[in-house]
Amino acid sequence: MDSNTITSFQDILQRMSKMQLESSSADLNGMITQFERLKIYRDSLGESVMRMGDLHSLQNRNATWRDELSQKFEEIRWLIAECRNILTRTENSFEQITFLQALQLLLEVESEIRTFSFQLI
């Protein structure tokens, strides 16, 4: 994983953890948790691609990896929708910057996961 992406994930997660949005903190904590899981999934998928011979063990270990992949794309779409929703509601510039960066990061990660998955298929 690119060091800028790691820094971006860490920066966004840190800033989100300091926020108090009008929506419940449970919603924000859920977003943070999903961001963290998405990062871990992306890292593990990237590592599998790096070890291209790992494709068969990945398929043997988890016959439903395509379903998992589909679920991750659904999570990304949900996170993108949530970021957009927050952006339309908030007037706080700190929140706007944070969620614009989160949105950009999600789009980058979605693209990377697509690239990794095509290499594994």
Curated annotation (Swiss-Prot):
One GO term of the biological process aspect: exit of virus from host cell nucleus through nuclear pore
Compartmental location: Virion; Host nucleus
Locus of motif Nuclear export signal: 12-21, 85-94
Record has Phosphoprotein as a keyword: no
Alphabetically ordered keywords of this record: Host nucleus, Host-virus interaction, Transport, Virion
InterPro entries attached to this UniProt entry: Flu_NS2
Primary localisation category: virion
GO cellular component labels: host cell nucleus; virion component
Pfam families the record matches: Flu_NS2 (PF00601)
Note: Average number present in a viral particle is estimated to be 130-200 molecules.
Functional description taken from the UniProt entry: Mediates the nuclear export of encapsidated genomic RNAs (ribonucleoproteins, RNPs). Acts as an adapter between viral RNPs complexes and the nuclear export machinery of the cell. Possesses no intrinsic RNA-binding activity, but includes a C-terminal M1-binding domain. This domain is believed to allow recognition of RNPs bound to the protein M1.
Homology family: Belongs to the influenza viruses NEP family.
Subunit record text: Interacts with protein M1. May interact with host nucleoporin RAB/HRB and exportin XPO1/CRM1.
Protein name stated in the entry: Nuclear export protein
Origin organism lineage: Viruses, Riboviria, Orthornavirae, Negarnaviricota, Polyploviricotina
Gene this chain is encoded by: NS
